[in-house]
Amino acid sequence: MANSAQARKRARQAAKANSHNSALRSKFRTAIKAVRKAVDAGDQAKAAELFKAAVKTIDTIADKKIVHKNKAARSKSRLAAAVKGLQAAA
């Protein structure tokens, strides 16, 4: 347990940041899963719509450094390829 006032405050701040960042990471994963689900279902219009929303979410979370920018870019690239593959198959 933290003994000094400064250490107690830092512990409170760390817990608050961890809670907030966990929620954002969850939002990141949920956005990716939603696009994947639409692609697997073969719903081209919904996949494109969800992809656009997912890109916005992914970029926001990468800007806040919740996930690394390279991981964000890789996720967007893979989702784009999946959506494009769905359009090519149609």
From Swiss-Prot:
GO biological process, alphabetically ordered: translation
GO-annotated cellular components: cytosol; small ribosomal subunit
InterPro entries cross-referenced by the UniProt entry: Ribosomal_bS20, Ribosomal_bS20_sf
Key words of the record: Ribonucleoprotein, Ribosomal protein, RNA-binding, rRNA-binding
The keyword Ribonucleoprotein belongs to this UniProt entry's keyword annotation: yes
GO molecular function, one term: small ribosomal subunit rRNA binding
Highest taxon of the lineage: Bacteria
The UniProt record lists the keyword rRNA processing: no
Function in brief: Binds directly to 16S ribosomal RNA.
Family: Belongs to the bacterial ribosomal protein bS20 family.
Protein name: Small ribosomal subunit protein bS20
Organism (species): Burkholderia multivorans (strain ATCC 17616 / 249)
Lineage: Bacteria, Pseudomonadati, Pseudomonadota, Betaproteobacteria, Burkholderiales
Gene transcribed to yield this protein: rpsT
